[in-house]
Amino acid sequence: MISLCSDWEFTREWSAGFAHGEGRFPLVDLPHTAGEVPLHYAKPEDYAGICGYRRGLSVPLEYRGKRLFLQFDGAAHFAEVYLNGEKLAEHACGYTAFRVEITSAVRYGMENRLAVRLDTTENPAVPPFGFVLDYLAYGGLYREVWLDVRGADVIEDVFVTTPTLTRAEIALTVSGSGARRRVTLLDAAGAVCAMAEGDDNKYYVNYSNARPWSLDEPNLYSICAELLDASGAVTDEKTVRFGFRTAEFRRGGFYLNGERVFLRGLNRHQCYPYMGYAAPEALQREDARILKEELCCTAVRTSHYPQSRHFIDACDELGLLVFTELPGWQHIGDAAWKRRSVENVREMVTQYRNHPSIILWGVRINESLDDDDFYRETNALAHSLDPSRQTSGVRYLEKSHLLEDVYAYNDFS
């Protein structure tokens, strides 16, 4: 993917003309916070409002015939995406990534104008908002933005599970015509370990020499999925990283690769003084290192929302277990709010389910009251998207209904 993190014009006062190129504004790079946050006594207007980001996008003529996507890793909190003044998409979650296809809207061989209208206020229609939060929800294009140039047929997703420590099961999601598929298992050095080819979207790879992913030896592998034309040439590819490991909560505790592991962990928020959420990759990785190497944690909870892929990547590499959860804090909104929250679960699971460090999906709004129909839906969705992991949800009422697989409770005694 091509980075689009530099040379964005930024304004804290959006106007309709901004999407059409009116005015000139200071340049910023991503990740970026919409308002610099003082160390003490911040007011909402210091970091919240309706702002705009804009930059040029050159698309060469040789991209004709390909499919072009913009990927936003984190746009807090309600984003509208414009290309050459035309609104193409909107996204109502500041904590999950989203993609926008621009193939039919782009001007080839010319400079295009990409603009984002970003509402960083606490919109009660958008989870986690609607009541008070016990954390500050900073705004901005605070994670990376990319241009993804793909073939006419596209591998949308690659999902890898490891039912045993020597077997990988691969599920592909492909859009387009009936291209032939090839999946290749690679070790950390890029050496080929195994390969499978066919016309289906499900493959099984056995590798007797696989080294399991564990806390002490977090061995990582990759699956490279490719689409092939009639001549055998690669027309599209997607690579994901994973680890051979089994993870299960049982009555007697948590078991990784069949061995009981004591979970000693902390909650982690993604905010920093002055920069809000807009921490670069190095800081995201440093937090994971501190948790594992200095604080001797075996686990971390991403309270109370999905966090940077750089942080989760570092957890994969260091051997730090992760309990990640949907955005929210105590409040449950109306029916439309719940539908958005369910969509948050869908995005969270599909975007993070290949990470071996993640052992638990949090599908209950933190410390919320019971809402059985809502939580049956979030649980069922997580299980359907990822049958390999269990669900949980943190509560503070002892007698609340347990619909998840694993009981989680905040003990404030």
Where are these regions (language model features)?
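Surface beta-strand/loop "capping" patches
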Residues: 151-177
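Extended acidic/polar, glycine-enriched regions
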Residues: 107-111, 175-250
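Accessory beta-strand-rich segments of carbohydrate-active enzymes
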Residues: 2, 8-15, 44, 48-154, ...
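Conserved, mostly hydrophobic/aromatic
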Residues: 85, 145, 221, 258, ...
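Substrate-binding/catalytic cleft of secreted carbohydrate-active enzymes
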Residues: 299-413
